[in-house]
């Protein structure tokens, strides 16, 4: 009997043609182009949510502080400006920032316990533990959307992306900066309580974003010392010689004493400031994210290294369209960068006595 053997027939699979390969590459490119914005949007949404949570935690801390001491912490920086009669001393500094005082209430009591509360953060006579406490980087005080988080403070102090709105210089008529129209915000020097916020806690901003001041060239230091508030007497005191005499060697933003660095959570001027807007020469119609574009500001006169320009001591964020604000009732809202300056004045002032427009929105 003959046996028939079946031979396997090998099938040849044809390869991709060049056209097919190009089509596949094009499809992959289209998918990536479609997915990348969605991924970036999801990441920003997560960062924005974390920023909101930071401010909520700060808000809870502020109210727990108020429960404990029957007043809010000081604004770090305050103002005793009066138009009538006019005076020339516009600023008063506490020994510490708002963010130093609330450390025990943001789960950082171990840091607070290292601090000599009667000495400023740059006073080296208070001992090494005092100085090292202020060098801690605290996630609750930084916005994750800050693109400059890789930059460290040259002197090693912890950074800050929020500040207390202690006053506003926005003119209620023109919407431009006008010192003669200054009014107090929710926090002050000396400290005040809920009762001082006559316009209502839900209508008055307490803390707002100012993100990115830690970037090289983004902020300036300036001789803003006038008088320290004496926490014992609740009166203006004298300058602390140790604080006045310090210059941070190697810090590109520092000059000669008594200059300070306005991006540290320990610094009174970083932790508290006004909402004023830029000078008329650099006015772009916004008090939130002013001069955000082009990146770095408009050269040569409206760049971010100038006071009150961009992220230098004004409301600013890298969230698209606006920034977060913590209100005095503990709520956090996102404010549009298109908000009218006059409305922003009403939101910052604590006792303006005027109603908010019903249609201004957030």
Report each predicted region and the residues it spans:
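N-terminal leader/signal peptides at the extreme start of proteins
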Residues: 1-18, 79-85
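N-terminal single-pass transmembrane signal-anchor helix
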Residues: 13-47, 57
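Internal low-complexity, small-residue/proline-rich segments
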Residues: 41-362
């Amino acid at each position: 009997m003959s046996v028939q053997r079946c031979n396997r027939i090998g099938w040849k699979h044809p390869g991709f043609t060049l056209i097919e390969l190009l089509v596949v590459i094009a499809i992959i490119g289209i998918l990536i182009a479609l997915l990348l914005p969605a991924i970036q949007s999801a990441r920003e949404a997560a960062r924005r949510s974390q920023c909101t949570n930071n401010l909520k935690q700060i808000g809870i801390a502020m109210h727990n502080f108020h429960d404990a001491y029957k007043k809010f912490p000081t604004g770090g920086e305050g103002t005793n400006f009066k138009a009538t009669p006019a005076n020339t001393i516009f600023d008063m500094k506490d020994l510490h920032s708002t963010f130093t005082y609330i450390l025990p209430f943001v789960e950082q009591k171990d840091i607070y316990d290292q601090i000599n509360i009667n000495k400023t953060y740059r006073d080296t006579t208070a001992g090494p533990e005092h100085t090292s406490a202020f060098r801690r980087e605290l996630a609750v005080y930084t916005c994750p959307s800050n693109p400059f988080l890789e930059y460290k403070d040259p002197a090693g102090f912890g950074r800050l992306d929020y500040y207390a709105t202690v006053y506003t210089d926005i003119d209620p008529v023109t919407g431009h900066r006008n010192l003669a129209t200054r009014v107090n915000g929710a926090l002050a020097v000396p400290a005040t309580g809920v009762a001082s916020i006559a316009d209502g806690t839900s209508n008055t901003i307490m803390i707002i974003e100012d993100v990115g001041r830690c970037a090289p060239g983004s902020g300036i230091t300036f001789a803003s010392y006038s008088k320290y508030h004496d926490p014992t007497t609740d009166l203006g005191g004298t300058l602390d010689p140790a604080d006045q005499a310090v210059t941070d060697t190697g810090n590109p933003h520092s000059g000669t004493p008594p200059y300070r660095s306005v991006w540290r959570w320990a610094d009174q001027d970083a932790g508290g400031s006004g909402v004023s807007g830029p000078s008329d020469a650099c006015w772009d119609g916004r008090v939130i994210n002013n001069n955000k574009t082009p990146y770095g500001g408009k050269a040569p006169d409206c760049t971010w290294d100038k006071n009150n320009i961009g992220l230098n001591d004004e409301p600013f964020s890298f969230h698209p369209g606006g920034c977060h604000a913590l209100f005095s009732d503990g709520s956090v809202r996102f404010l549009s960068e298109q908000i009218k300056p006059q409305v922003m004045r009403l939101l910052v002032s604590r006792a303006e006595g005027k109603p908010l427009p019903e249609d201004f929105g957030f």
